[in-house]
Amino acid sequence: MESLTLQPIARVDGTINLPGSKSVSNRALLLAALAHGKTVLTNLLDSDDVRHMLNALTGLGVSYTLSADRTRCEIIGNGGPLHAEGALELFLGNAGTAMRPLAAALCLGSNDIVLTGEPRMKERPIGHLVDALRLGGAKITYLEQENYPPLRLQGGFTGGNVDVDGSVSSQFLTALLMTAPLAPEDTVIRIKGDLVSKPYIDITLNLMKTFGVEIENQHYQQFVVKGGQSYQSPGTYLVEGDASSASYFLAAAAIKGGTVKVTGIGRNSMQGDIRFADVLEKMGATICWGDDYISCTRGELNAIDMDMNHIPDAAMTIATAALFAKGTTTLRNIYNWRVKETDRLFAMATELRKVGAEVEEGHDYIRITPPEKLNFAEIATYNDHRMAMCFSLVALSDTPVTILDPKCTAKTFPDYFEQLARISQAA
């Protein structure tokens, strides 16, 4: 297996122009495909997950042109639901941001489409979404294991009263929200359980509004969506920088700054993961907010005990930053780490122990006490981009770290290690 050894980093300083947000890129691509008119998306993320969405749109007959660097995309909207000519199979890799929204959107009208993906995708639950779509009339068949992809979709979603469990993934609700306006009837979506990752729902609502559709949000408990609507192209749309990707550089500055400035997001960003900067500030770093940037300057870091349900992806970065904080850090209410690219609670606990941390792994929490000195270790990444990026922070000690399968960052940030090297000074 390929590996990358990072030598100790003495200091980080500089500016990072963030790649586009994965969450925003894939939502914007789907809405642009469903909309009337031509949409030009700029600062689109070029990564595995986005390529899977683009490949699916090609399979569905959507025409678009990409710039040479794949960050500008011109899409000719379909002016309504997407249809396949005859039976079709779409392979979506391990891209939850493609699988979940497409599973819903392709239930409009009459299709015969199979959605499948990598082995890990077949372990990521989708039952709550399928249950909700079936309540709205959709005809969906599990082809292998009940409640997991691959799925066969045969249309039929017309709207009506739909319940969805919000406790596992907010992407199920996102998928329903984006699909419901195009259904013939009105849809009332009721949320069962506690809604996780609520800020991601705000991204969805924000984008839908950009494409001309507003819905009634009743305190995130119930959503009322008028049927028979259509999305309208906004003309051009700039994709925000990826706030989850920003977390690694901001944390690096908190540990070994200097000052690092990330551009492409700022105080008015729609992504909940910008709140990660508040967590670093609480730990002792200095944060400065602009309209189009966030900067972080080193501080003496202290441990925290926090509910991280609102920023689950960025919270992983706090788990490795905790290695540099004084005291024991506890991250709570993060059960949904277990259903991501890998079981992130298990993976994080296992790898933190390798570098010498004392770790308690609970059902939905992790408690981390750093060692006096970090051990040199080979870090397994579990084909999870965030594991690779989080553990790069270990090099901010006086100990090198080896990252196995470093190219797994291609899911969201193909040139992550080059960007980190650009702001790093060797010890």
Curated annotation (Swiss-Prot):
Gene3D superfamilies, per the entry: Enolpyruvate transferase domain
UniProt-annotated location(s): Cytoplasm
Catalysed reaction equations from the record: 3-phosphoshikimate + phosphoenolpyruvate = 5-O-(1-carboxyvinyl)-3-phosphoshikimate + phosphate
EC number: 2.5.1.19
Any Gene Ontology CC annotation: cytoplasm
Keywords associated with the record: Amino-acid biosynthesis, Aromatic amino acid biosynthesis, Cytoplasm, Transferase
One example of a Gene Ontology biological process annotation: aromatic amino acid family biosynthetic process
Residues involved in 3-phosphoshikimate binding: 22-23, 27, 169-171, 197, 313, 336, 340
Active site: 313 (proton acceptor)
GO molecular function, one term: 3-phosphoshikimate 1-carboxyvinyltransferase activity
Coiled coil segments of this chain: none
Associated pathway: Metabolic intermediate biosynthesis; chorismate biosynthesis; chorismate from D-erythrose 4-phosphate and phosphoenolpyruvate: step 6/7
Predominant place of localization: cytoplasm
Residues annotated for phosphoenolpyruvate binding in this entry: 22, 96, 124, 171, 344, 386, 411
Role: Catalyzes the transfer of the enolpyruvyl moiety of phosphoenolpyruvate (PEP) to the 5-hydroxyl of shikimate-3-phosphate (S3P) to produce enolpyruvyl shikimate-3-phosphate and inorganic phosphate.
Subunit structure as annotated in this protein's UniProt entry: Monomer.
Annotated family: Belongs to the EPSP synthase family.
UniProt cross-references to HAMAP family, sorted A to Z: EPSP_synth (MF_00210)
Official protein name in the record: 3-phosphoshikimate 1-carboxyvinyltransferase
Gene: aroA
